Curated annotation (Swiss-Prot):
Annotated function: Part of the ABC transporter DppBCDF involved in dipeptide transport. Responsible for energy coupling to the transport system.
InterPro entries recorded: AAA+_ATPase, ABC_transp_ATP-bind, ABC_transporter-like_ATP-bd, ABC_transporter-like_CS, Oligopep_ABC_C, P-loop_NTPase
Lineage of the species this protein comes from: Bacteria, Pseudomonadati, Pseudomonadota, Gammaproteobacteria, Pasteurellales
Name of the protein in question: Dipeptide transport ATP-binding protein DppF
Enzyme Commission identifier(s): 7.4.2.9
Taxonomic source organism: Haemophilus influenzae (strain ATCC 51907 / DSM 11121 / KW20 / Rd)
Membership in a protein family: Belongs to the ABC transporter superfamily.
Length: 327
């Protein structure tokens, strides 16, 4: 690995990431593949938030698992400050663990119920650093203060906390190694509405204080509008539209993006959109439709859409769109 980093090099650069899962239906059946992720590319700058949105099954959580190397991609490239993050040498593995962390969706399942909070937060330091016991405890207490947890919580168990407090613990654990990138996989969807805003505001404050970059995975577009700098809309394993938050919310172009936004409640009557009701379900990733994957549900679909797959193309405003019928 080289330490030379060009000034304009993005913090994280994903190129054509793919994840295919083999499926066997019988001894003599032809092998099939589930294309959970099929060629996703993006760049993430320091201190910015990229939101990844779409229906369940679109591949957004799979993307998060690939970025943190919980699973290895079938194909593609991933670079951190220009360094190949898919290499398996010990130096790259150690750097990966420190620089990219994840906060999972369910704070009730992501914390070990048999361990005290102090032990949960110390574990990354024990594995990845050479800090003394005193230094580890000091770092844990400092991080607990940052996320709004009192010092006396150090010796308590996860079941003693509310959902919002548990997610604060999960966020603290993700930040113990001072990462640059945090993958937040639906971090507030399992929480009560009353505490969602508190956790989101905490994440934004930590981003400002620590210079964090987020890959924010969500299906809640009202949350995305509040926190994201850029939005990537996914459908059946592919990116179909990507742009700044303002571009996506003020002028969506892909029919699927329009349908998603039409279902999002708006406070101002002037901002409300005509509701677009999609028919049918998300197609099977084992047997996706020919041409554009969205064509069976799209009111704009033509023969061209049913025969050809549109590629993601950049338009004059910088937005990326994969559709033959742009307004």
């Amino acid at each position: 690995m080289t330490n030379e980093v060009k000034e304009n090099t993005p913090l994280l650069n994903a190129i054509g990431l793919k994840k295919y899962y083999p499926v066997k239906k019988g001894l003599f059946a032809k092998p099939q593949q589930v294309k959970a992720l099929d060629g996703v590319s993006f760049q993430l700058e320091r201190g910015k938030t990229l939101a990844v949105v779409g229906e369940s099954g679109c591949g957004k959580s799979t993307l998060g698992r690939l970025l943190t190397m919980i699973e290895e991609p079938t194909k593609g490239e991933l670079y951190y400050k220009g360094h190949n993050f898919l290499e398996n040498d010990s130096e790259t593995k150690a750097l990966r663990r420190k620089k990219i962390q994840i906060v999972f969706q369910n704070p009730y399942a992501s914390l070990n119920p048999r361990k005290k909070i102090g032990s949960i937060l110390e574990e990354p330091l024990i594995i990845n650093t050479k800090l003394s016991a005193k230094e580890r405890r000091e770092k844990v207490l400092s991080m607990m203060e940052k996320v709004g947890l009192r010092a006396e919580f150090y010796d308590r168990y996860p079941h003693m906390f509310s959902g919002g407090q548990r997610q604060r613990i999960a966020i603290a654990r993700g930040l113990m190694l001072d990462p640059d990138v945090v993958v937040a996989d639906e971090p507030v969807s399992a929480l009560d509405v009353s505490v969602r805003a508190q956790v989101l505001n905490l994440m934004m404050d930590l981003q400002d204080e620590l210079g964090l970059s987020y890959v924010f995975i969500s299906h809640d577009l009202s949350v995305v509008e509040h926190i994201a700098d850029e939005v990537m809309v996914m459908y059946l394993g592919r990116c179909i539209e990507k742009g700044t938050t303002e571009q996506i919310f003020s002028n969506p172009q892909h029919p699927y993006t329009k349908a998603l936004l039409s279902a999002t409640p708006r406070l101002s009557p002037n901002l409300r959109r005509e509701r677009i009701k999609l028919t049918g379900e998300l197609p099977s990733p084992i047997n996706p439709p020919k041409g554009c994957a969205f064509n069976p549900r799209c009111w704009k679909a033509t023969e061209k859409c049913r025969e050809n797959q549109p590629h993601l193309e950049q338009h004059t405003d910088g937005k990326l769109i994969a559709c033959f019928h742009i307004d």
